[in-house]
């Protein structure tokens, strides 16, 4: 139960509550510079967080075989089962013991952290579409505040307030409260702040509060992924005080923090952004941003050419900027246009390597597009929620505010790059590849209005499990098979936890899907309801295990990584076609729901897959799906809608329409 609720808290992206009532303000504390003033220091719990457990090898093998069962025929399953037995008693046992020993020697981190960073940073595929997702903000409830200049100014100020609050250790620690009446109180916070940090987690645990890992937060700002041959580098320069702004492919910088570390006045930021928006320069012939969409080794070589061509200092300004603000010159037409714009755009007005891009369209539609190597969205989601809350509830300017009378032509620096013929050729080649890839991507969206979380909970069913069941039914209806499915689950309850995989395709979802899709007339509504209940119970178990670090994917990944690192012949288990198949995730899924979130999306993780972003709200279910040319996203969504209609019919005791 605890794990399930924890998962709802961070993986589902519930809105972060307001900061605790402040301590008496000390001299020099300026409230307008900060989002909140937490009684408990931001990183108070970090030292005492529990360590990510390494599952028992026998549990991992059992879970792995359970996940393989719906994907394999009897002959394939017997072969995989035999390989698992050999692995468990042979080389797998040795590797597991080595992993446990290594973990005991590295108590400052988790067993997955290093290998997971390596996995991302050694990947040579472009970051855009292959790794970077986006989350879009809901519009400001006050429509006049959705003006592009107004919203860009307010969101920028709120973002810098977050930065200052985080670095001053004044941001509320990320904690999930099972009993907020006891733990989310001033009384408890005043007590726990005096408990030494190496014991503080235990103090919170005693009142059913669960602090979460916040180690990824320091990479939010002033950070960029730098392309390097073979393995990229994560770069952070927290001394830099300037913002990077992209518009029409041009690069601009100006300081958002003064020399004393105070936020530049909102009216000055407004003036500088207005100045940038009024720049009528034509788009550059060779937009540099395309290079961040390239294969990482090609980009590394071209970046070296940029550096040796006299652009090192200018590139340094891009890399060290607090973040990248992208101002687009067009309004958003609909959800599909929004998804294409925020997931990839036209390639000219994003710096895909930046820890995050804050994108604001002409009509004020806003989104965060983020690079994935540095973190898993835990920090991004907290930042996202806080920026939305602050910019809508305590905006720095109003639509009537006048920009400061300041000389923006001096304060704003336009960055110019010296491009050799080789670099121009490289940019043109990158554009060609980017355009071709984007052209092959389709995105479509549905909103199922018949019901959502409230109805499903009344039926005592997990809303997430029912959404996942709908995807299984839809794929079976469309393509006639059950395939490898991935749902991400945060393990932020542990020090340096990353993610674990929930495997939603199970023998229960397969049985239930076949009943609904292939022979619904054979079963009564009651029998179908019982099948759905079994799916829900099992999905809850998988979710609970994953959140507690008790999945199988990360453990097997770490064992495989260890074998490769130590030059050991790759165990047969990892050469089994079934292992490759279960890691070829045709259905890759992720869910978010928050008062701040409008919609999110990512591209398929394999060429013949679907990328499924979904949200189960109180009274509706939204689903945003991406696909390349070998799959039909529109048809898949029609099948999802049919699945949901059938499920709701069964839950209401009606016959399933064939």
UniProtKB/Swiss-Prot annotation:
What InterPro entries does the entry give? Carn_acyl_trans (IPR000542), Carn_acyl_trans_N (IPR042572), CAT-like_dom_sf (IPR023213), Cho/carn_acyl_trans (IPR039551), Cho/carn_acyl_trans_2 (IPR042231)
Asked if the keyword Acetylation belongs to this entry, the reply reads yes
- Pathway(s) where this gene product acts: Lipid metabolism; fatty acid beta-oxidation
Q: Which compartment or compartments is the protein found in? A: Mitochondrion inner membrane
Membrane topology of this protein? Peripheral membrane protein
**Which residues are annotated as modified residue N6-succinyllysine in the UniProt record?**
69, 85, 239, 418, 424, 439, 510
Alphabetized, the UniProt keywords read: Acetylation, Acyltransferase, Fatty acid metabolism, Lipid metabolism, Membrane, Mitochondrion, Mitochondrion inner membrane, Transferase, Transit peptide, Transport
One of its GO biological process terms is:
carnitine metabolic process
Locate the residues binding CoA. 452-464
Major location category of this protein: mitochondrion
What function is annotated for this protein? Involved in the intramitochondrial synthesis of acylcarnitines from accumulated acyl-CoA metabolites. Reconverts acylcarnitines back into the respective acyl-CoA esters that can then undergo beta-oxidation, an essential step for the mitochondrial uptake of long-chain fatty acids and their subsequent beta-oxidation in the mitochondrion. Active with medium (C8-C12) and long-chain (C14-C18) acyl-CoA esters.
Family per similarity comment:
Belongs to the carnitine/choline acetyltransferase family.
Return the PANTHER family for the record: CARNITINE O-ACYLTRANSFERASE, CARNITINE O-PALMITOYLTRANSFERASE 2, MITOCHONDRIAL
- What protein is this chain from? Carnitine O-palmitoyltransferase 2, mitochondrial
Tell me what organism the protein belongs to: Bos taurus
